Regions:
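Carbohydrate-associated surface elements
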Residues: 5, 136, 157
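A short helix/loop element that forms part of the nucleotide-sugar donor recognition site in Leloir-type
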Residues: 14, 164-179
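Conserved donor-binding/catalytic core segment of Leloir-type glycosyltransferases
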Residues: 131, 180-196, 202-206
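Nucleotide-activated donor-binding/catalytic signature segment of Leloir-type glycosyltransferases, i.e.
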Residues: 227-250
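Acidic donor-binding loop of glycosyltransferase active sites
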Residues: 256-273, 288
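Short hydrophobic beta-strand element within catalytic cores of glycosyltransferases
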Residues: 280, 285, 289-292, 302
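Conserved acidic donor-binding segment of nucleotide-sugar-dependent glycosyltransferases
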Residues: 301-305, 309-316, 325-331
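A short, well-ordered alpha-helix in the C-terminal region of glycosyltransferases
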Residues: 318, 325, 332-347, 356-359, ...
Length: 369
């Protein structure tokens, strides 16, 4: 794996990477190495000025690193994740080595922009395989010019051991947040960005708390909308909890504290959308029923009526009805969570996902060069 430098990244993955060797590259002094997720996009909609200024340096650094690596070692295939910028840069650097492109969400939004589209098309012309975590993302990029027979929709995986239910740890986060043992706790996790749809969830709170005044809602994460949500939370003191960014090693216990997971994802005003949020898979592995929007790659994981409820995006009325349905029937909610856990264990483990990638790689390598 080749990745841009981030403090502790290579050391952490090498330690428990399961045989994956991690190489990193530098492209600027550490304080300026800001490309990636919240540090690159403002609310996942606009490129921040500082990040835009670093993009040429990032491109040069990645190009040099790929060329250097391929000169020293032989690789059967290069799989560049995010068509923009990594796929574009890799296509210019790999020479005759076969190339695959992986799609994740914001990269597709960028690839469709008029000034970038021509680069994306050239990258696709150089690629043998296209993978994506949702049918929508794959279809949107195929529309730029890529054959369906060489496209694969492959969901993300989840570590079902790390996120296993553990009733003995259910009270850790409840005590920290001041949520009583028997109170319904609805959990959302993710960056505070428009496409996560938390603003839609907040629209349901008056109705939710009128029907269930004992309910608590926890939205965990940081981002550009956090301050706005903090101001709004004053309307529901002691009922809407915003703990901010949660450390990765404490996240499983936060899921264990919850009764229901909610992520009402949306297409934002510019068409940007998540592929398949990892937190949905983590919630399923934790044995939680999931209420989410039925868009993008989410229906690959959540089965409406079986492992949770899928609702139309940007529809607070339908979202509220689904939340009240499950909060009002704890037995049914638990059964949905158990089925979700079973699906995670059988279909969404990393071994299952790796097998699907392996099939795609074999297809790519069987093509004439």
């Amino acid at each position: 794996m080749l990745a841009p430098h981030a403090a502790g990244l290579a050391a952490g993955w090498t330690e428990d990477g399961g045989g994956v060797e991690v190489r990193t590259f530098r492209y600027a002094p550490e304080r300026y190495e800001v490309l990636g997720y919240g540090r690159t996009l403002e609310s996942d909609e606009r490129v921040r000025g500082g990040a835009a200024a670093m993009t040429p340096l990032y491109g040069l650094g990645l190009h040099r690193a790929v060329r250097r690596l391929l000169a020293r070692e032989r690789f059967d295939l290069v799989h560049a994740h995010w068509i923009v910028p990594n796929g574009v840069i890799a296509a210019a650097a790999v020479g005759t080595t076969p190339l695959a492109i992986g799609l994740h969400g914001s990269d597709v939004f960028l690839a469709e922009k008029p000034g970038v589209r021509v680069l994306a098309r050239r990258t696709l012309a150089r690629s043998r395989l296209l993978t994506g975590c949702s049918p929508e993302l794959v279809d949107r990029v195929r529309a730029l010019g890529f054959p369906a027979e060489r496209s694969r929709v492959i969901p993300y995986g989840v570590d079902v051991a790390t996120f296993a239910p553990d009733p003995a740890r259910r009270g850790i986060w409840r005590e920290r947040l001041g949520v009583p043992d028997g109170a319904p706790l609805l959990l959302g996790v993710g960056r505070m960005a428009t496409k996560k749809g938390f603003q839609v969830l907040l629209e349901t709170l008056p109705g939710l708390l009128a029907a269930r005044p004992d309910a608590h809602v926890v939205l965990a994460g940081a981002g550009d909308l956090f301050d706005r949500f903090t101001v709004l939370s004053a309307q529901w003191p002691g009922r809407l909890h915003l703990p901010g960014k949660v450390l990765r090693d404490t996240l499983p216990d936060l899921f264990r504290a919850a009764d229901l997971f909610v992520l009402p994802a949306v297409h934002d005003a510019k068409g940007n959308v998540d592929g398949l949020p990892n937190v949905i898979l983590e919630a399923m592995a934790s044995g939680l029923p999931v209420v989410a929007s039925g868009i993008s790659g989410i229906p690959l994981a959540v089965e409406d009526g079986a492992t949770g409820r899928l609702v139309p995006e940007k529809d607070p009325g339908k979202l509220l009805a689904a939340l009240l349905e499950l909060v009002g029937d704890p037995g049914r909610a638990r059964a949905m969570g158990e089925r979700g856990r079973g699906k995670a264990e059988t279909e969404l483990t990393w071994d299952a996902v790796a097998a699907r990638y392996r099939e795609g790689y074999e297809l790519a390598l069987s093509m004439p060069g």
